[in-house]
């Protein structure tokens, strides 16, 4: 998206085409010092420019912890989230094994000072990474791992 950035794993058009209203993705989220939770993302509706998602958080046993919130995102903005600088990022072809399944994918690893952010994108699932980690000074401070996907 920028001349000093790597190509993104998916184009805005691929993200739009991969957005299926009614799809529900659940991800286990862990933050340093907090209990793990499940983040739920539901694809609600789409048009040529963007899509509407609904989000909420659940406990590991499925109890809703907050009211759902809807958000509209523009396809190009979603693509831009994966735009990473060449001088700080490596890209590797990998096999991704998560509770949701095993996928061929791309692993983007961005290093900025003591912070290492790693994003695993399943090439068959245009959109958000199915796994993410953030480490600061070697300590894991955040992770998100897709655990289930339900399509209509």
What do the PLM-derived regions correspond to, one by one?
Residues 1-152:
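Acidic, serine/threonine-rich low-complexity disordered tracts
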